[in-house]
UniProtKB/Swiss-Prot annotation:
It is a multi-pass membrane protein. Belongs to the UPF0060 family. InterPro entries: UPF0060 (IPR003844). The chain crosses the membrane at residues 7-27, 33-53, 62-82, 88-108. This is UPF0060 membrane protein Krad_3114.
Length: 111
């Protein structure tokens, strides 16, 4: 059950961080205004909080593993929201990152 909770928290963290960064980008680069920037800043703050809810106690391990989720999530966000079409190298790299997440977070360790 901890693994499912952890995965759900990684997905939530990715939505908050990537979505927050996208909102700031839209506010600044696309001149959509302060409301977009403010919403992005709030989402980014919530991302920081979501990471603390991971069942794993080691900050470094959680953040290292999250890096792989961020890579895959960013490509997925770009495909869904911005119409970006990842090529085979994007997909291969994202899969390698997700394998890394699995090893770092969920490999059996001695107690």
């Amino acid at each position: 059950m901890d693994v499912l909770r952890s995965i759900a928290l990684f997905v939530l963290a990715a939505l908050l961080e990537i979505g927050g960064a996208w909102l700031v980008w839209q506010g600044v680069r696309e001149h959509r205004g302060l409301a977009w920037i403010g919403a992005g800043v709030i989402a980014l703050g919530l991302y920081g909080f979501a990471a603390t809810l991971q069942p794993e106690a080691q900050f470094g391990r959680v953040l290292a593993a999250y890096g792989g989720v961020f890579v895959a999530g960013s490509l997925l966000w770009a495909a869904v929201v911005d119409g970006y079409r990842p090529d085979r190298f994007d997909v291969a790299g994202a899969l390698v990152c997700l394998v890394g997440v699995g090893i770092v977070m969920y490999a059996p360790r001695p107690s």
